[in-house]
Structure formats: structure tokens, C-alpha cells
């Protein structure tokens, strides 16, 4: 099976094909997320050893990380504490439930099923070392390391998250009642809401998937940013849990480990070949970008990037 050349023209074709799908809508349970252009559709690819290519159908603006930010405490804590300790706090099993499921935690707790669920990310945020401002500085350090630059927190989204995040509060209190929250509920949730409220441009989202694709090395300088062990574990979790109860469908269609967010960002990795980010705020009931999945599937087929292909 021959593959196409990776060109701007190919990316443009993928965007225009995705635009034909009018399903989904912006996430409205976090009110500020509804205030975006729902027709925005974009893709960027960083092939290892080559220049970045990107195409968007509308002017770009910063978009919040939402659940793509769950990669930050996962990777940071893996690097600092190691896998054995991290797996004392969360499991790494696909859940088959939605990203904010309380039932799953009640039935199969006290450990959350995996770090990509809200409960898992909240549990990991409670294990960030330090107290108060020290924990926020830890978060800023790892944001800068994983994005190769500083990012800002969108204050309106942060306030919106805090105002409407009652389900996440329920998860945090349930974790606390099961002795699996390592810090104060309110302080932990402030960290979690801040994590989701960092915002980035499309090109800024590319650094992390490119590093993961490159065995933890900076794609430009070759500097070892993350250990190979952390990359291996992170990619395995993305491949099995990155799109919640739609991960299996995603992997069958694309063969790319990925992590989605309800803001419309999805980052994806082709190990040894490329880092990818797609953006479209039209999400489905599972919290995944519909047009984003269309673009990733089209790119995988065009480039023969499915992991199961020789």
C-alpha cells in the first residue's frame, strides 16, 4: 500500500473533508467553552526531521487544553516518582465509561481506573508535591517543559470551571472519602481547574506529541526531555485510554495513540515518525472532536501511519 507525500495540500484536503460533517456541538456544560467559533477546523503535523506543516480554515486563536492537559501531571509525576509509585495512586485500565463517571469510581475504586479520566487526573493533581503556590509552580514548570514555552491560564474559563464543576467536586470528595486524595479537596480542584484552563495556539500543542514520537527527545536539538520509560508508558495509556469509551474505535480507525479534550484539541503520536494536533470544537457526547477524528483517520490512511501496518 503506497502512501502520499505529506504536503499542505493534503492537510487542506483533510480539513475540507472534515468540514462536510456538521455533527456535534461545542461543549456547553463549561459555559465559556461555548463561546468559540464552532466551524474552526485545523490540523498541524511535525514530521521528525522535517518542517512543521499546518492548515486551518479560519483564523487561529488560543484554545484551552481541557483534558489534553491531563498529560501534564501524568508525565511529570512519572518522571519524578516513577511508575511503581504512580500506579499506587491510579490504575491503567480502560474504563468503558464516560470521562466524569462517578459510578465507575464507586464500583471499582478507591483507585481511579486510569489517569485520563477526570477522577484519575484529580487524584494525580492531589499528589503534586508541595503546598499552595509550590504546587502551582510545579505545574508551571512542567507546562513549560512539555510545551517548550510558558502558557497562560484563561481566567474566564478557570472561573467557569470552578463555578460549574460540581461533578468534579463529587469525584474529589469520593476520592477523599476512600483515602485516595493526597491533599485538600479545594486546593486539589484549583490545580485541576487550572490545568484544564491553560490555553495554547495550534503550533504550541505540537511540541509534546513530537517529543513523544521522538523517544523523549526534542525534535530540533536532540536533547533528552523525557525518559524512554515515561514515553513508553504514556503512549500505552494514550493508546488504551486517551479517548475514554471511544478509544477502541479511534485506534481501529487511526492506529495512533492520542489524547482528546472537550475544547476540540486532540494530540496524536506516530512513534518514530510524527507528532500531530487537530482542532475542531464540535465534539460528540463522549467529549471527542468529531472533525478531529475525521482528519486523523484521513491522515493515517493517506500516510499509512496505522500502528498495525508494517
Swiss-Prot record:
HAMAP family given in the database record: Glutaminase
Recorded GO MF terms: glutaminase activity
Species of origin: Legionella pneumophila (strain Paris)
Gene3D superfamilies (alphabetical): DD-peptidase/beta-lactamase superfamily (3.40.710.10)
Protein name, per record: Glutaminase
Catalytic activity: L-glutamine + H2O = L-glutamate + NH4(+)
Any one Gene Ontology BP term: glutamine catabolic process
Keywords (A to Z) from UniProt: Hydrolase
Assembly with partners or alone: Homotetramer.
EC number: 3.5.1.2
Amino acid at each position: 500500500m503506497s502512501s502520499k507525500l505529506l504536503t499542505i495540500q493534503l492537510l487542506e484536503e483533510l480539513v475540507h473533508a472534515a468540514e462536510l460533517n456538521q455533527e456535534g456541538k461545542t461543549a456547553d456544560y463549561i459555559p465559556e467553552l461555548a463561546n468559540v467559533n464552532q466551524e474552526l477546523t485545523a490540523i498541524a503535523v511535525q514530521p521528525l526531521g522535517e518542517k512543521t506543516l499546518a492548515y486551518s480554515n479560519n483564523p487561529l486563536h488560543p484554545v484551552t487544553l481541557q483534558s489534553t492537559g491531563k498529560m501534564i501531571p501524568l508525565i511529570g509525576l512519572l518522571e519524578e516518582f516513577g511508575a511503581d509509585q504512580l500506579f499506587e495512586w491510579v490504575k491503567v485500565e480502560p474504563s468503558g465509561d464516560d470521562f466524569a463517571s462517578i459510578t465507575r469510581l464507586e464500583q471499582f475504586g478507591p483507585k481511579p481506573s486510569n489517569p485520563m479520566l477526570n477522577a484519575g487526573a484529580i487524584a494525580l493533581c492531589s499528589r503534586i508535591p508541595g503546598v499552595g503556590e509550590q504546587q502551582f509552580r510545579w505545574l508551571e514548570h512542567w507546562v513549560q517543559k512539555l510545551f517548550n514555552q510558558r502558557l497562560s491560564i484563561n481566567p474566564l474559563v478557570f472561573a467557569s470551571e470552578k463555578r460549574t464543576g460540581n461533578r468534579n467536586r463529587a469525584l474529589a470528595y469520593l476520592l477523599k472519602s476512600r483515602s485516595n486524595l493526597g491533599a485538600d479537596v479545594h486546593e486539589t480542584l484549583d490545580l485541576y481547574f487550572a490545568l484544564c484552563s491553560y490555553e495554547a495556539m495550534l503550533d504550541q500543542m505540537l511540541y509534546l506529541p513530537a517529543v513523544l514520537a521522538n523517544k523523549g527527545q526534542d525534535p530540533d536539538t536532540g536533547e533528552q526531555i523525557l525518559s524512554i520509560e515515561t514515553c513508553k508508558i504514556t503512549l500505552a495509556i494514550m493508546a488504551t485510554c486517551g479517548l475514554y469509551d471511544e478509544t477502541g474505535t479511534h485506534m481501529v480507525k487511526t492506529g495512533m495513540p492520542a489524547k482528546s479534550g472537550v475544547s476540540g484539541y486532540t494530540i496524536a503520536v506516530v512513534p518514530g515518525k510524527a507528532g500531530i494536533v487537530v482542532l475542531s470544537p464540535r465534539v460528540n457526547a463522549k467529549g471527542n472532536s468529531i472533525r478531529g477524528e475525521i482528519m486523523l483517520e484521513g491522515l493515517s490512511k493517506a500516510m499509512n501511519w496505522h500502528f498495525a501496518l508494517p
